[in-house]
Structures are given as C-alpha cells and as structure tokens.
C-alpha cells in the first residue's frame, strides 16, 4: 500500500512542479509566433488543473483559427468557459487582465466575424460565375461557412440570414424559411435586422 501511495504522491509532486511551466513556455512561443511549438506546450498545459482554462483559451483564440479548424475552436473555447466566474486572463501579453468571460466573448466575436464576412464574400463570387456546377459548388461552400459561423456563435442572427439566403439561391425553400424563422426567434434582434430577415423571407417565397 505504501508503495502505491508514494507513487501517487510522486505523481502529484511532479504535476505540481511542472504546473505553469508549460503555459509560460507556450506564451513565449506565442509571442515569437512559433505556432506549432505553442500548440504543443498549450496541449500539455491542459493537463494542469490551474492552467487548463487559460491554455484552452489560447488554443481557441490563437492556434486553431489560424488553421481554420473551427470545431477545435469551439471545443477549446467550451473548456475555457468552464472557468469560475471570477477567473481573469490576459488575452495577449500586452493586454490588461480581464474576466475570462469577456475574453471569450471578444474572441468568439472575432472568429465569428471572420466566418461571417467570408460567407458574405461568396455573393460577389456567384455574381461572376455562370457555370451551373461551379455556382452550385460555391453555394455549398457558402452554406458550410455560414453553418460554421452559426455553430461558433448561435446567438448572432447574421449567419442565419446567410443560410436563409444561400438556401434560397439553392432552391431549398424549406431550409431557407427554417433559418430565417430561427433568426427571428433569437433574443434581442434589432428591428432593422428583423425587417431585413422578413424581406429575405418574402424573396425566398417567390
């Protein structure tokens, strides 16, 4: 029994000894823009209870948006969001400490906007393409991008509006109306956005 007990005590001591070191090493790599090394140390830091929330935030905020791995962005931001309400973090080395919840909200907005504006960009591409197969492929890409934005921040009406629009272009009126209805059901949707959604619904019905 004493051998097993000493083994677990040893594991705890080793874990305590290295707690913080992986996170600090990751921050140095982030500052130097050594993204692969930073990812490696951040993933290690996830194993330290005191560091896991900050490590998860940096993975979701700085590492996986670069590779456009939006599933991992959401996965690690969900982990970061389990931090206690009074947890504070410096989003970057030059920032003052703010609540983790504020840092998460700002980061998600940044990633959402990137996806949303990419989704809207497909409209100009569609206007320049006449080939049916190419248009269909672009519409599918636009829908996928809009869905990624919606999954990342389900409370933003813009991604639902884009889904309604692109499904309407695709000729799928059921899905077009579904996403417009979902957007209108979101809390605190501004009146001008509601009006735009209703206009879009009218166009989809034609």
Q: Where do the protein language model's features map onto the residues?
A:
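Amphipathic alpha-helical repeat scaffolds of TPR domains
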Residues: 20-21, 27, 51-65, 90-129, ...
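Residue-level detector of the short coil/turn that links helix A to helix B
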Residues: 33, 67-68, 137, 171
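N-terminal, post-signal-peptide region of Sec/Tat-exported proteins
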Residues: 36-76
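Single-residue signature of alpha-solenoid repeat helices
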Residues: 38, 72-73, 135, 142, ...
């Amino acid at each position: 029994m004493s051998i097993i007990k000493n083994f677990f005590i040893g594991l705890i001591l080793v874990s305590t000894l290295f707690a913080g070191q992986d996170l600090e090493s990751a921050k140095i790599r982030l500052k130097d823009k050594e993204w692969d090394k930073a990812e490696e140390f951040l993933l290690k830091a996830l194993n330290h209870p005191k560091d896991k929330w900050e490590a998860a935030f940096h993975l979701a905020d700085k590492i996986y948006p670069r590779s456009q791995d939006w599933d991992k962005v959401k996965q690690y931001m969900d982990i970061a969001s389990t931090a206690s309400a009074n947890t504070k973090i410096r989003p970057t080395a030059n920032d003052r400490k703010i609540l983790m919840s504020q840092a998460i909200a700002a980061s998600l907005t940044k990633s959402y906007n990137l996806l949303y504006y990419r989704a809207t960009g497909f409209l100009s591409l569609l206007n320049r393409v006449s080939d049916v197969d190419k248009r269909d492929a672009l519409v599918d890409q636009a829908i996928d991008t809009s869905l990624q934005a919606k999954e990342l921040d389900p409370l933003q009406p813009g991604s639902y509006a884009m889904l309604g629009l692109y499904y309407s272009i695709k000729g799928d009126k059921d899905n077009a109306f579904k996403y417009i209805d979902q957007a209108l059901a979101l809390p605190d949707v501004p009146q001008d956005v509601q009006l735009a959604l209703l206009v879009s619904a009218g166009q989809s019905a034609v």
